């Protein structure tokens, strides 16, 4: 099975964001899926530039593993976090296109 983790939660629910990031990192480390990709969308994009401790470690391990696909450029502009995302190495693209690509490629969407 292939999974797309769609991280949507932000400052309104940071624990939900952390759970998604942690679950993704543990899933990649344990090779639970044939493939796992992450798309950050909306409020979650604000948190990426503020990551620390376990969250930062999880993000970095996912980045090194190639699991992080992208963040939505329109939402990055809306939240004024384009530079923070680019500084973390996150590719900016159109989330709708990326989600459609993964769904059409047989990935199951899991959202946090």
Give residue ranges: language-model regions.
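Short, glycine-rich nucleotide/cofactor-binding loops
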Residues: 4-20, 43-51
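A short aromatic-anchored loop/beta-hairpin motif
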Residues: 61, 80, 86-100
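Histidine-anchored nucleotide/phosphate-binding helix
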Residues: 16-30
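Short internal beta-strands
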Residues: 24, 35-41, 69-75
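A glycine-rich helix N-cap at a beta->alpha junction
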Residues: 52-82
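C-terminal binding/interaction regions
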Residues: 105-111
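Short, intrinsically disordered low-complexity segments
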Residues: 37-47, 63
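Short, structured coil segments at secondary-structure junctions
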Residues: 65, 88-89, 105
């Amino acid at each position: 099975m292939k999974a797309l983790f769609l991280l949507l939660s932000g400052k309104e629910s940071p624990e939900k964001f952390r759970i998604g990031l942690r679950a993704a990192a543990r899933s990649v480390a344990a090779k639970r899926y044939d493939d796992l990709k992450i798309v950050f969308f909306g409020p979650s994009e604000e948190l990426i530039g503020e990551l620390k401790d376990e969250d930062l470690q999880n993000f970095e391990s996912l980045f090194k593993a190639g699991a992080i696909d992208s963040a939505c450029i329109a939402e990055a502009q809306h939240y004024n976090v384009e530079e923070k995302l680019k500084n973390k190495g996150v590719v900016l693209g159109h989330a709708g296109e990326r989600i459609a690509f993964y769904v059409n490629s047989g990935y199951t969407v899991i959202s946090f």
